[in-house]
From Swiss-Prot:
N-glycosylated. A secreted form is released from the membrane after cleavage by gamma-secretase. The chain crosses the membrane at residues 14-30. Glycans are attached at N109, N114, N117, N333, N432, N446. The keyword RNA-binding does not apply. The keyword Lipid biosynthesis does not apply. Disruption phenotype: Mice are born at the expected Mendelian rate and have no visible phenotype at birth. Adult mice display abnormal leukocyte recruitment to inflamed tissues, hypersensitivity of T cells to agonists that activate T cell receptors, an age-related decrease in the cellularity of kidney glomeruli and a tendency to develop proliferative glomerulonephritis, plus defective nurturing behavior. Mutant mice show increased responsiveness to treatments that cause delayed-type hypersensitivity. Mice show increased incidence of autoimmune encephalomyelitis in response to injections with MBP. This is Alpha-1,6-mannosylglycoprotein 6-beta-N-acetylglucosaminyltransferase A. Residues 31-740 are lumenal. UDP-N-acetyl-alpha-D-glucosamine binds at E525. The lineage of its organism: Eukaryota, Metazoa, Chordata, Craniata, Vertebrata. It comes from Mus musculus. One of its GO terms (biological process) is positive regulation of receptor signaling pathway via STAT.
Length: 740
């Protein structure tokens, strides 16, 4: 037995009445026009009644379909059926009225000539834009007008791919792909996010639900301690977080007062530490308490703390079993399409080791999570090594590259690779409140402290250290039984606790670099305690071309000193970059340091608050899943032309600016360059890291043919590179002045 809703019954009745009255109105119009042309009021009143019934009919149907989307691809029994129904109805009425008009016109005017004149003055309803009923019913008439694709550089290429490959996997048809351009566009905008959403399409209900979940800052660590207690591998990080807890809580409260942290979406975040898994073969967690490398653990603990305090939902994995458990919903999915439903994760923080584990675990589903990845990568990955086929063509054999990610998805320890993103870390202050009161009373001694806790770092450095010893005492913190490279006059304290090291630094005037290790946190700790840093200069610069340490790393970056960040972004009076083999230069620097009085200095970006600000900006603004979201804002763009032999990184740095790779796409067309007075008489597309570029003699422009190859690194031998630079906040290099 069939049941009908009152609304459907009402709309059917109204439809029947509308057709009936339409016919009656037409007949009466004919009658009144011939017999009673002096009474237009009656016809007008009847017309108003018909219009009123029509409005009620449309309103009834609209009420039935108020929650559905319009358009030929919206599905059956939706608002688009309303158009089909009205199309049939109106077509029927218009055909009848057209015939009536023709007959009435002939009867009234009597001649074809007059008829022509009359229709010129008052156009027939039928002569207006015709409605093709068959097209509407078949879903053809409503054209799929595509929105502008600005900011979605991959959209056009993906549409071309879909045209050829949409039958390669039945999942595309399950999502409504039917071979038409509009269905391709809907899939690529709503399922895979490569294209802008069509304006008439409803929003994804899962996205709407996600936006209802807002992040609220946290001011205690109870939940985080509970999560980390389950893993012995996290012991060192947990102790660091506990030591710094008060500073972190003060920082999040301070940041919340300075900028609006409300109405932020709470993200589901996976943190997978591949370097701590048993399968990695590393023993980092085991050696953390016995002089092993700590840089990665420092960065991971500070990242986890920041994500937690900013109010996001985090899940931490340090084993393959945990990773599989978290991602079990998509593990084994062989489909080329993403899984339907609520997202498991929205952001994934991972390292290079974990990246390989993650890809193997997910299988084909990997492609749907690539855009969510943020890869902790201390030394950086340049576009030349990230692009698999390009790296292959150049003969690069690094085991760490060829991931084909957006280069900005790699997060570095220092802001040394502008093609990547600067994540950083926090320089720890090991002192409690009573210590701080006492430490300010400590008088600086005429002494230096050498940066090098391993005996081998001191090899062949005696002549350099002798110069320093002429002017002051030399102290060290070398551990281990071997001290054969350490001069006899050095006072070695062995391994010190963080607190004791802080007191020693407060007594010291000079922190002495030996040239290795590269880019460590210790010089920043020394500067924060009021020491000057003697930073060894490298001439020629060190890179994978001349230094074994860098061989195999996915970068051709050249280090001009032991600590390029300190050299470029801090400088004198805190940092003195000198040639160790130039006695006069070393002596002059030591004398100047002894004669100066400097205050402790800590760049904001290496404080708890600075890191919270930076990570929050990245989470809120960086988006590699929805086309190229315009951040940093274009207002920060400053275009520079590099001379032949000069990279974009260099030319921007010379102007106290930063190369900003996200702006390259706005300099990759002839019309774009006209704004900056660069006129191309000819142009071509080329897939290389050295373009876009300009050859002044012939005014020939070369544009980028592969978006993953945009690069701030690399110098063209004959062309001028066209470089996108931006400003930055002093002490917060990752952010431009308009970025917050």
């Amino acid at each position: 037995m069939a049941f009908f809703s009152p609304w459907k019954l009402s709309s059917q009745k109204l439809g029947f009445f509308l057709v009936t009255f339409g016919f009656i109105w037409g007949m009466m119009l004919l009658h009144f026009t011939i017999q009673q042309r002096t009474q237009p009021e009656s016809s007008s009143m009847l017309r108003e009644q018909i219009l009123d019934l029509s409005k009620r009919y449309i309103k009834a149907l609209a009420e039935e379909n108020r929650d559905v989307v319009d358009g030929p691809y919206a599905g059956v029994m939706t608002a688009y059926d309303l158009k089909k129904t009205l199309a049939v109805l109106l077509d029927n009425i218009l055909q009848r009225i057209g015939k009536l008009e023709s007959k009435v016109d002939n009867l009234v005017n009597g001649t074809g000539a007059n008829s022509t004149n009359s229709t010129t003055a008052v156009p027939s309803l039928v002569s207006l834009e015709k409605i093709n009923v068959a097209d509407i019913i078949n879903g053809v008439q409503e054209k799929c007008v595509l929105p502008p694709m600005d900011g979605y550089p991959h959209c056009e290429g993906k549409i071309k791919w879909m045209k050829d490959m949409w039958r390669s996997d039945p999942c595309y048809a399950d999502y409504g792909v039917d071979g038409t351009s509009c269905s391709f566009f809907i899939y690529l905008s709503e399922v895979e996010n490569w294209c802008p959403r069509l304006p008439w399409r409803a929003k994804n209900p899962y996205e709407e639900a996600d936006h209802n979940s807002l992040a609220e800052i946290r001011t205690d660590f109870n939940i985080l301690y509970g999560m980390m207690k389950k893993h012995e591998e996290f012991r060192w990080m947990r102790l660091r977080i506990r030591r710094m807890a008060d500073a972190w809580i003060q920082a999040i409260k301070s940041l919340a007062e300075k900028q609006n942290l409300e109405k932020r979406k709470r993200k589901k975040i996976l943190v997978h530490l591949g370097l701590l898994t048993k399968e990695s073969g590393f023993k980092i967690a085991e050696t953390a308490f016995s002089g092993g490398p700590l840089g990665e653990l420092v960065q991971w603990s500070d990242l986890i703390t920041s994500l937690y305090l900013l109010g996001h939902d985090i899940r931490i994995s340090a084993s393959l079993a945990e990773l599989k458990e978290i991602m079990k919903k998509v593990v084994g999915n062989r489909s080329g399409c993403p899984t339907v439903g609520d997202r498991i994760v929205e952001l994934i923080y991972i390292d290079i080791v974990g990246l390989a584990q993650f890809k193997k675990t997910l299988g084909p589903s990997w492609v749907h999570y690539q855009c969510m990845l943020r890869v902790l990568d201390s030394f950086g990955t340049e576009p030349e090594f990230n692009h698999a086929s390009y790296a292959q063509s150049k003969g690069h054999k690094t085991p760490w590259g060829k991931w084909n990610l957006n280069p900005q998805q790699f997060y570095t320890m220092f802001p040394h690779t502008p093609d990547n993103s600067f994540l950083g870390f926090v320089v720890e202050q090991h002192l409690n409140s009573s210590d701080i009161h006492h430490i300010n009373e400590i008088k600086r001694q005429n002494q230096s402290l050498v940066y090098g806790k391993v005996d081998s770092f001191w090899k062949n450095k005696k002549i350099y250290l002798d110069i320093i010893h002429t002017y002051m005492e030399v102290h060290a913190t070398v551990y281990g039984s071997s001290t054969k490279n350490i001069p006899s006059y050095v006072k070695n304290h062995g391994i010190l606790s963080g607190r004791d090291l802080q007191f020693l630094l407060r007594e010291t005037k000079l922190f002495v670099g030996l040239g290795f290790p590269y880019e460590g946190p210790a010089p920043l700790e020394a500067i924060a305690n009021g020491c000057a840093f003697l930073n060894p200069k490298f001439n020629p610069p060190k890179s994978s071309k001349n230094t074994d340490f860098f061989i195999g790393k996915p970068t051709l970056r050249e280090l001009t000193s032991q600590h390029p960040y300190a050299e470029v972004f801090i400088g004198r009076p805190h940092v003195w970059t000198v040639d160790l083999n130039n006695r006069e230069e070393v002596e002059d620097a030591v004398k100047a340091i002894l004669n100066q009085k400097i205050e402790p200095y800590m760049p904001y970006e290496f404080t708890c608050e600075g890191m919270l600000q930076r990570i929050n900006a990245f989470i809120e603004k960086q988006d590699f899943c929805h086309g190229q979201v315009m951040w940093p804002p274009l207002s920060a763009l400053q275009v520079k032309l590099a001379e032949p032999g000069q990279s974009c990184k260099q030319v921007c740095q010379e102007s106290q600016l930063i190369c900003e790779p996200s702006f390259f796409q706005h300099l990759n067309k002839e019309k774009d360059l006209l704004k900056y007075k660069v006129t191309c008489q000819s142009s071509e597309l080329y897939k290389d890291i050295l373009v876009p570029s300009f050859y002044p003699k012939s005014k020939h422009c070369v544009f980028q043919g592969d978006l993953l190859l945009f690069s701030c690194a690399g110098a063209h031998p004959t062309h001028q590179r066209i470089c996108p630079c931006r400003d930055f906040i002093k002490g917060q290099v990752a952010l431009c002045k308009d970025c917050l």
